[in-house]
Each structure stands twice: as C-alpha cells, then as structure tokens.
Amino acid sequence: FSPGSSQIVGSFEKGDTKNINVVRIASKNFTEQHILAEMMAQMIEKRTHLSVDRKFNLGGTIICHEALKRGEIDLYAEYTGTGLMAILKFPTMNNPDEVYQRVSEEYLNRFNLAWLEPFGFNNTYTLTVRKQDAVQNKWKVISDLIPVSSKLVAGFSGEFQERPDGYPGFQKIYK
C-alpha cells in the first residue's frame, strides 16, 4: 500500500478575483476531511485577515481535484498516496518522502498546483473488526480471516475498491 501522508494542496492562482480576501476551503465527503478542513479554516481565520468560505463535503477525490484545477476552490487536504495513484496514475511507491517529492513535482508541472508541507500524520487503510469477534475467533492478523472470509461482509469506500493499493491490492496479497 502506498504511504498516505496528508497535506494541503492548493492553487497558485485565485479563481475568484472579485474577493481576494476570502479563501475557499473544500473537503471531501468523510469525517476526517471535515475535521482537517475546519482546522485549516480556523487557523486561517485566527492568524490572518482573510475570511474563509467553507465548501465542505464537496465530494470525492476527483471532484475536489477538478474544482481546484478550475479555480472554484483554493485548497483542500489531500493524501500523497491518493494523489500518486488516483490522480497521477502512478504505481505504488513505499517511501513517503519519495512519494511526496514525486507528487509535488508532478502536480506543479501538470496542473500548476502546489503541495504544502505534510500535516505530520500518516493515514493508511486498515481493517476493523469487533473486539468480541477478534477475541472469540483468535484473530490477530489479517491472514487469520482467510478461513472465514466467505462468511464476512466488508464495507469499503468507492475509492478504496478501485485503487490498485486498495481492495485490488488487498485481494492479491490475501487470496
């Protein structure tokens, strides 16, 4: 799986030149993104003279990326692994620093978009099961689920189901 550190990606050019004192912050359509976007909004409001137009729950990766390219938003939090694979269509890389460098360069060259410094945490996919089930069945690692996999029901985001480092990669490893 590709490392997925989170950082802000934003445009160099302000799309809405009517109001240069407003920063339009978007988020994807899940809780972690709402929290990150709100944190960015509050920091900007507290530390600058700028106002923030919150465009939270905008949609998935492609929707946010395209809105940023079109100048409809000014920034949103993105994950380097998502940028690498979902937007740039590059294969998995395992070194977080190399992923960040590659994504930063490609976004600048292809889209004139800048990646800022990482937020300082890594976000990777994992599986979660009820503790009671894990204890009762002695599940400690993912491979412990293989014998009962036909009886399990999993729920994944649409992006995880399609990304090579998501469900397809998971299936290759745990078939």
Predicted segments, located by residue:
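A conserved helix-loop-strand patch within extracytoplasmic ligand-binding domains
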Residues: 99-154
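A ligand-binding cleft/hinge motif common to bilobed small-molecule-binding domains
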Residues: 77-92, 98-105
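Ligand-binding cleft/hinge of the Venus flytrap
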Residues: 40-48, 142-175
